[in-house]
Curated annotation (Swiss-Prot):
<keyword id="KW-0949">S-adenosyl-L-methionine</keyword>
<feature type="topological domain" description="Lumenal">
    <location>
        <begin position="492"/>
        <end position="538"/>
    </location>
</feature>
<feature type="topological domain" description="Cytoplasmic">
    <location>
        <begin position="217"/>
        <end position="222"/>
    </location>
</feature>
<feature type="topological domain" description="Cytoplasmic">
    <location>
        <begin position="112"/>
        <end position="113"/>
    </location>
</feature>
<dbReference type="GO" id="GO:0006656">
    <property type="term" value="P:phosphatidylcholine biosynthetic process"/>
</dbReference>
<keyword id="KW-0443">Lipid metabolism</keyword>
<feature type="transmembrane region" description="Helical">
    <location>
        <begin position="114"/>
        <end position="134"/>
    </location>
</feature>
<feature type="topological domain" description="Cytoplasmic">
    <location>
        <begin position="560"/>
        <end position="894"/>
    </location>
</feature>
<feature type="topological domain" description="Lumenal">
    <location>
        <begin position="1"/>
        <end position="90"/>
    </location>
</feature>
<feature type="transmembrane region" description="Helical">
    <location>
        <begin position="91"/>
        <end position="111"/>
    </location>
</feature>
<keyword id="KW-0472">Membrane</keyword>
<feature type="topological domain" description="Lumenal">
    <location>
        <begin position="135"/>
        <end position="195"/>
    </location>
</feature>
<dbReference type="InterPro" id="IPR016219">
    <property type="entry name" value="Phosphatid-EA_MeTrfase_fun"/>
</dbReference>
<feature type="topological domain" description="Cytoplasmic">
    <location>
        <begin position="388"/>
        <end position="394"/>
    </location>
</feature>
<dbReference type="GO" id="GO:0032259">
    <property type="term" value="P:methylation"/>
</dbReference>
<keyword id="KW-0812">Transmembrane</keyword>
<feature type="topological domain" description="Lumenal">
    <location>
        <begin position="244"/>
        <end position="268"/>
    </location>
</feature>
Length: 894
């Protein structure tokens, strides 16, 4: 029956439930948002609280009052309810049902089985093809109304007997408020059509039950397996009954009998019931009883017939109802609504080109697509054209494992760093690209690894698959059916997610671009589940594992499932909470429906048990969070700690060697006297030196000091020892006397006649181009023995937090002046194309500290002018600031 109700308000016509469902299924956050996310619930028509009258509207615009319809009435069951007086048509329906029952008992063996199977398929075809054809013609041309009128059902003059019979039949089925003569012809035609539907639906149901009974068998399995099989079957039957009953409670007879093909209903919408549990519940979970009966009968033929009938029902939805919805209500609103980013500083909001999604929108001229095609062909050929040996199987499983691990690690790591620090976007901005360029590169990488993880998994399953020798006995047929079902569920889930989220959500756009408003709209599949990909997103892997029946494929499926859960738990969920905060939904449709059903059934859970479950759940979450935090902390600190360990080890070895030298030189240094050495930084009143400014150092030493003495510049803290320098100066040193170290004598500005004092100037390459605390060290002869040290001083660089171009240009000019001595600060169009690589590196290093932005040194030379570089900085800061603004805006509203 129809999976529709009505969309309604006080001035617009109502649409079917299936219509509402379709029109609301638009728009992967961003997973909640993979911006991933949407929700509306299905609807029911509710009578006005002040008046029981419901209004209908015909296609011609006529408004009429509908007869009273008791909410608990099940009109279709009145046909076989012996407590309800029977009309002539009821007797016809009951007679056809009894004829099938009689046919069941007068036949036996294979004749009965195939006869009942034929009866069932006859009525199923009558439903999906017969009723489908009638509704198709009614939707396009109002043909059902024309045919009924043309046959004389409502023609009192020319067909008085048929008229009176129709009148009595319809009035017997309706409330006393029903007025046959004054009701619109569309409404009366709908009532006549309902009688034909009753015949088909009741006979379809009864013929299925008889067919299942005819094929009943007792498979060879242990007693416990029989208990599980039959118990699960009855549970599915009970669940199916509840779905049908609750669906009728929600949609009533109007949508049950496809009323919106004949007229529209006006009313108020309420979103509840089974329509929050699953998409198209009347056509999806509404047929769970088929599979329950298949389990009870233990017959593969019943299962096969059930699958065919269920697929036919989906075809009815696809070719009859959905086109009617699109034609009647339009399909524009059913398209996925893109979450557009904030203004990206005069950049186009979204690229005009169509992104490759799996292999859709494939472009042979796009390098990333060509790479995807070549890798795909290579991985397929590698499996198909190799012998079916253990080595070839290991190779197939190995490449599937590698691609799964690569996809999961890259997926999780990149998104995690992007969510927290915008590392991916910053990387591309540092190379002169935009935020859209960063997102575009991510989309190509994500689609490549995603496709390869699926392709290699399929090929591994193919390599490990063995064609069954017997489909009837054992679990071969069942495994294949269940596996294909899982694969179909996976495909449906993925398509639904993409339809709901669009390109922006599918490719995690809210990780890379700021959305217009951090608010979630739950539609489509997301109105039933918060994270459908959590389990259904890996269903195909389990399906292929069942079909292949290989432990290695089961392992790969488990790996895929665990990695998906891990990314959702440790990457997507924290990101969603960071962006959307209180906007996240507490309960999904499924959870809400189950809770409501539990409350209605007066099922209470002991308080102690609730508290125990809550404690266990919170403990598990705490352990998971702590484990994730520890792993993340290890990954963040492992690199620096290893570098620090190597540095300390090297320094220790050097220190031990230099101690030996110190012992040898100790008598000589004592003879010279450390107190006779002095080192002073010129003009150091506040111990601060501007970034890039030359530093003059005054020194004095005994008259008999070594001519090979030298002065080095070091970061404070790099050398724990005050007597021996343990780290390299990396070229930042100066001789104290000329003609000794020819390459480091240019910095000498003054040398006293006695050569016991002087001034050296550290500038250009001799400086540190990083803010921080530094000191000078005077060393004896050609070694690292420290004779004296200067006072520590700080190299300072002012930060600029503004995003305004003029402010940035003002802050940038002194930096350029420091990095390029002799430039004209007033010339904002100063050319930068001819500067050296070292000078460009200094500039980008200064920009990193002053503006908190990282650029590649080539960007400076590409921009060519200070003004252009300032605009690039302003643009980059605005892009990155837009993320912070969207986060802070959500926090303020939370």
């Amino acid at each position: 029956m129809i999976d529709s109700a009505a969309k309604e308000n006080t001035i617009t016509p109502i649409m079917s439930l299936e219509t509402e469902e379709a029109l609301n299924s638009g728009g992967k956050s961003c997973e909640e948002q993979k911006c991933k996310k949407n929700a509306t619930a299905n609807i029911k028509v509710v009578e006005n609280e002040d008046s029981e009258a419901r209004l209908g509207q015909t296609p011609s615009g006529q408004i009429f009052v509908l007869p009273h319809d008791p909410p608990n009435r099940r009109s279709i069951l009145e046909t076989v309810d012996f407590r309800v007086p029977k009309t002539p048509w009821d007797l016809v329906v009951d007679g056809v049902i009894l004829a099938q029952v009689l046919l069941f008992f007068v036949t036996s063996g294979m004749v009965r089985r195939f006869l009942m199977l034929g009866c069932f398929f006859f009525w199923r075809v009558s439903y999906d093809a017969g009723i489908g054809y009638l509704l198709h013609k009614q939707s396009h041309q109002q043909k059902i109304v024309d045919w009924i009128v043309g046959m004389g059902f409502f023609d009192k003059t020319n067909h008085p007997k048929l008229y009176e019979m129709t009148k009595r039949q319809l009035k017997a089925k309706m409330d006393s408020s029903y007025d046959f003569e004054n009701s619109p012809v569309e409404f009366n035609a709908w009532l006549v059509f309902r009688h034909f539907v009753d015949l088909v639906l009741m006979c379809d149901f009864c013929s299925y039950v008889l067919m299942a009974c005819a094929w009943l068998c007792w498979p060879k399995m242990n007693f416990f397996a029989h208990i599980l099989r039959i118990g699960a079957g009855y549970l599915l039957l009970v669940f199916n009954l509840w779905v049908k009953m609750d669906a009728h409670r929600v949609v009533r007879d109007y949508a049950w009998y496809w009323g919106d093909f004949f007229f529209r209903l006006r009313g108020t919408l309420v979103f509840n019931g089974v329509f929050e549990l699953a998409p198209h519940p009347m056509y999806s979970i509404g047929y769970a009883g088929y599979y329950g009966m298949s389990l009870i009968t233990g017959s593969y033929m019943v299962l096969f017939a059930s699958i065919v009938a269920h697929m036919a029902q989906f075809a009815f939805l696809l070719f009859v109802e959905n086109p009617h919805i699109a034609r009647t209500y339009g399909s524009d609103s059913s398209k996925a609504k893109e979450f557009l980013p904030h203004d990206l500083v005069n950049e186009p909001l979204l690229p005009a080109q169509k992104d490759t999604v799996v292999f859709f929108n494939f472009d042979i001229t796009r390098v990333s697509d060509v790479g995807l095609a070549l890798l795909s062909v290579y991985s397929i050929v590698l499996v198909l054209f190799t012998p079916n040996s253990n080595y070839a199987r290991a190779l197939a499983v190995g490449q599937a494992f590698i691609w799964r691990v690569a996809h999961s690690l890259l997926h999780g790591f990149i998104l995690s760093r992007q969510s927290k620090t915008k590392a991916w976007t910053r990387h591309f901005i540092s190379r002169g690209n935009s935020a859209l360029d960063a997102w575009a590169q991510w989309k190509g990488l994500y689609n490549l690894t995603l496709c390869m993880s699926y392709i290699t998994f399929i090929m591994a399953s193919w390599k490990m698959y063995s064609f069954p020798t017997n489909w009837i006995y054992g679990s071969a047929f069942f495994r294949h059916v269940l596996g294909l079902t899982f694969i179909a569920l996976h495909i449906y889930t993925s398509v639904s997610i993409f339809d709901d989220l669009g390109n922006f959500g599918w490719f995690y756009g809210d990780f890379f671009l700021p959305v217009q408003s951090p608010k979630l709209s739950y539609r489509g599949i997301y109105r039933y589940l918060n994270n459908p990909e959590r389990f259904f997103g890996s269903a195909a892997f389990w399906g292929m594992a069942l079909i292949s029946n290989s432990s290695w494929i089961f392992f790969l499926a488990l790996l895929a499932q665990v990695s998906t859960l891990g990314i959702i738990r440790f990457v997507e969920k924290p990101h969603m909470q960071r962006i959307y905060g209180s906007g996240l939904r507490k309960e999904a449709g499924v959870e809400k429906t189950i809770k409501q059903a539990t409350l209605k059934s007066n099922i209470t859970i002991p308080t102690a048990l609730k508290q125990r479950v809550k404690t266990i759940t919170s403990t598990i979450d705490k352990v998971i969070d702590q484990t994730a935090g520890a792993v993340e902390e290890f990954l963040d600190t492992a690199g620096p700690k290893v570098h620090e360990l190597l540095h300390d080890t090297s320094a220790h070895i050097r220190y031990q060697a230099q101690l030996s030298v110190l012992k040898v030189l100790d008598p000589h240094t004592k003879q010279l006297g450390l107190s006779n050495y002095g080192l002073e930084v010129d003009d150091l009143s506040d111990r601060k030196i501007p970034f890039g400014a030359p530093i003059r150092v005054k020194w004095n030493a005994p008259a008999n000091h070594s001519t090979h003495d030298w002065i080095g510049l070091y970061r404070v803290g790099d050398n724990p020892s005050t007597s021996v320098t343990q780290t390299s100066s990396q070229g930042r040193w100066s001789a104290v006397q000329p003609d000794v170290y020819s390459s480091h004598s240019k910095s000498i500005e003054y040398l006293s006649p006695n050569k016991d004092s002087g001034v050296v100037c550290f500038s250009d390459d001799l400086l540190f181009w990083k803010p921080g605390m530094y000191e000078f060290r005077y060393h004896h002869s050609k070694n690292h023995v420290v004779m004296t040290r200067s006072q520590p001083f700080e190299i300072v660089l002012s930060r600029c937090d503004s995003v305004v171009y003029e402010d940035i240009l003002t802050a940038l000019k002194p930096i350029i002046s420091a990095c390029l001595p002799g430039v004209d600060l007033e010339d904002s169009k100063l050319p930068l194309e001819d500067i050296s690589t070292d000078q460009a590196k200094r500039i980008v290093l200064a920009i990193r500290y002053a503006f908190k932005l990282s650029f590649e040194h080539r960007v400076v030379k590409v921009d060519g002018k200070v003004s252009v570089l300032a605009r690039r900085i302003s643009k980059a800061k605005k892009i990155l600031q837009s993320f912070s603004d969207s986060f802070s805006a959500e926090k303020k509203t939370a």
